[in-house]
């Protein structure tokens, strides 16, 4: 794909030149490799007004910026023409879009990155992205209320998909139907922060690795809330707007989790270290900005792989293994401690042995 090749060629070296362009737009050609053997064109037609579309672009355009043009609608005719067939990146952010035609992106067969952030979109048509091999979709800062997971099925052939739905009004996600004609989306990174979820949405069967629910009014985490997400490695539940209650074994469905962010929850209610039961691979835990100080006893016993914990205000704890002054007896285990220190001060506090 063009974007992947573009990143690879950055390591080889590039030369940037200006090319003739449509009046008001800027066209920059970047050449790469030995003897300038490969070139990409970036076209910037931002901040010109709605009259700019449809705009003719060079045949080998890789990225088109149409942001901040007060565009109110996008359809197939706006994104049609010889130069659009090679587009790998399209920026439609900071416009006035309230709706998108289902076939708007149907001719963009190589599109990998799409930015629709900072618009007024209230709904997504079904199968709107199925014609493009998208790997990154930004829909943050819109007015979406209810979204179907099936809307993100793309022509990606199994490639990882990153979706940003943060800062919307979403209160419900519709799961992918079991008997759908199209396969489930390959979403590996999903940002749902600062929406209106009162419960963890049903995301089972998505190949998620990263999930953020920051800033939502979640009231509790049910033991089966993360069912079907065994591959998740990074979970962020920071700055939740409710009084979060963490029951015992609340993360038992996430055996592969490595990073857990619970920061910015001053009213977090604790149910003991059993909350983290089953998180045998967790390495980083962020409890900063919460009332969970001192750390619960037996924390390291439930989190054998834990390497660092953030607590209180600017306090960082790191895992240390103490061998002792003498050789250990056969069969004995080294003493594992959490050594905590203020990140703003050079003087470290004494270790807390758990």
UniProtKB/Swiss-Prot annotation:
Tissue expression: Expressed in macrophages in inflamed wounds with wound expression starting 2 days post-wounding (dpw) (at protein level). At 7 dpw, expressed from epidermis and extracellular matrix in the wound edge to neoepidermis and granulation tissue and in panniculus carnosus under the granulation tissue (at protein level). After fibrosis, disappears in the dermal area at 11 dpw (at protein level). Expressed in the hair follicle during morphogenesis and the hair cycle (at protein level).
Lineage: Eukaryota, Metazoa, Chordata, Craniata, Vertebrata
Protein name (Swiss-Prot/TrEMBL): Tsukushi
Example GO BP: camera-type eye development
Location within or outside the cell: Secreted
Function: Contributes to various developmental events and other processes such as wound healing and cholesterol homeostasis through its interactions with multiple signaling pathways. Wnt signaling inhibitor which competes with WNT2B for binding to Wnt receptor FZD4 and represses WNT2B-dependent development of the peripheral eye. Plays a role in regulating the hair cycle by controlling TGFB1 signaling. Required for the development of the anterior commissure in the brain by inhibiting neurite outgrowth. Essential for terminal differentiation of hippocampal neural stem cells.
Pfam family, one: LRR_8
Family matches, as InterPro entries: Dev_Immune_Receptor, Leu-rich_rpt, Leu-rich_rpt_typical-subtyp, LRR_dom_sf
GO MF, one annotated term: transforming growth factor beta binding
Cellular component per GO, a single term: extracellular space
Deletion consequences: Expansion of the ciliary body and up-regulation of Wnt2b and Fzd4 expression in the developing peripheral eye. Delayed hair cycle with down-regulation of Tgfb1 throughout the cycle and low levels of phosphorylated Smad2/3. Failure of the axons of the anterior and posterior parts of the anterior commissure (AC) to cross the midline, leading to an almost total absence of the AC in adults.
LRR repeats: 60-81, 86-107, 110-131, 133-154, 160-180, 186-207, 208-228, 231-253, 256-277, 281-302
Additional remarks: This factor is named 'Tsukushi' because its expression pattern in chick embryos is similar to the shape of the Japanese horsetail plant, tsukushi.
Main location: secreted
Signal peptide boundaries: 1-17
Record keywords, A-Z: Developmental protein, Glycoprotein, Leucine-rich repeat, Neurogenesis, Repeat, Secreted, Signal
Species of the source: Mus musculus
